[in-house]
Amino acid sequence: MRHYEIVFIVHPDQSEQVSAMTERYSNIVTGRSGKIHRLEDWGRRQLTYPIQKLHKAHYVLMNIECDQESLNELEHSFKFNDAILRHLVIRMNGPITTPSPMMQEGKSRPPHSSDEDSENTAPAKAKTADSPGEDTRTTEESDPKP
């Protein structure tokens, strides 16, 4: 059996259905003596570019070990599920069980409750960029006139 990494993006209106979808896809893999090495729900995230006029979507990552028939059935399910906007299947050399960088990033930062919080922290970050030790004066300010 081969190892695969699968990422699929779910329509944001179907976020409540993600757990049922992952359960269904997990059953496809394990039903044919496959294994799931890692299953991560990254949650609703901003898309890099709009897909079907949507700017946010729900991301899910799976690292699995399965045969070709199971993989074909998974891909068939992805293609004919209207809730899945995009999917990507990559063949891996071996199983990956460590948390992905997306999950590590989420643990190191406190979660933001809304978009307003990120707007409020942006000016604070800009203010802290100018440290007291830096010389940020213009030439008019730095050259005293007699």
UniProtKB/Swiss-Prot annotation:
Residues 106-115, 134-146 have a biased composition (Basic and acidic residues). Coiled coil: none annotated. GO terms for biological process: translation. HAMAP family: Ribosomal_bS6. It comes from the Bacteria. One of its GO terms (molecular function) is small ribosomal subunit rRNA binding. Belongs to the bacterial ribosomal protein bS6 family. This is Small ribosomal subunit protein bS6. Signal peptide: none annotated. It comes from Nitrosomonas europaea (strain ATCC 19718 / CIP 103999 / KCTC 2705 / NBRC 14298). The gene is rpsF. Transmembrane segments: none annotated. Residues 94-146 are annotated as: Disordered. Binds together with bS18 to 16S ribosomal RNA. Keywords: Ribonucleoprotein, Ribosomal protein, RNA-binding, rRNA-binding. One of its GO terms (cellular component) is cytosolic small ribosomal subunit.
